[in-house]
Amino acid sequence: MKKRFIIRFLKIFFGILGCLVLAIMLFIGGFWWKYRSFVDVARKEIPAAITGEYPLSSKVDPFIGTGGVPWTCAYNFPGVSLPFGMMRLSPETASMLTSDKALNTSGYFYGDDKIIGFSHTRLVGTGATDGGHFLIQPIADQKLPGETPQEVQHKYSHKNELAYPGYYSLELPDKGINVELTGTERAGVHRYTFDDTKNPGILLDISHTLGDKRSEDAYLKILNDQDLEGHIRSFGSFAGRYGGIKVYFAAKFDTPFAKYQIWEN
């Protein structure tokens, strides 16, 4: 009787264990297939007009060092930066699995399938998380709640991405938004093109930081219907050791605001 009970128990136990192992393998296999399907997509080619004028542009791949498995990379970013420049304007991404911010300390991981927005500062290749200042988030036909802006994450595909030295672009067809980034040594230049049928908007997150870092003492002044200025103190992997770093900005829009709203805390 006891022997039969043990045999029955073992059958049930190993049956449950087998089902659990199978479920885990199916989950891992499904996620791996989804991951490979996303990262293996071919990106846009650099226009002939650019390669004709700047032949060496075709020899540079800004996406090198932005991906890796498992979630390890060279902490590079695909955005805009000039030699010895202060500006490092680039997209930020969120995880395919959890929707958390990219584990890449520069803010962009090639295996992430969501775009959070476009920020202006970061470190490169250090493995230290510092920067992510003044995140810009384009929106279209999105209703915002009365007290705090909803977290904005756009699904995207690498087939709609293009980057070469000094330029980055991304199309978000589902939202009817086209993003273009370029810059100078100390300024980032954004161009957002919206479909005529969309209700366009821009969110500026002054308190944003890369990763799980924090910020405080945000300040914003609206000068007129096209100009803003402000500052923030952020505490990253380096700056947090020395009381944080205070970063200032001035922003100018080429189109006057139809209306604006400010959120705090």
Describe the residue ranges of each PLM region:
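Long, compositionally biased intrinsically disordered regions
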Residues: 1, 34, 210-212
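N-terminal type II signal-anchor transmembrane helix
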Residues: 4-40
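Accessory carbohydrate-recognition regions in carbohydrate-active enzymes
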Residues: 38-265
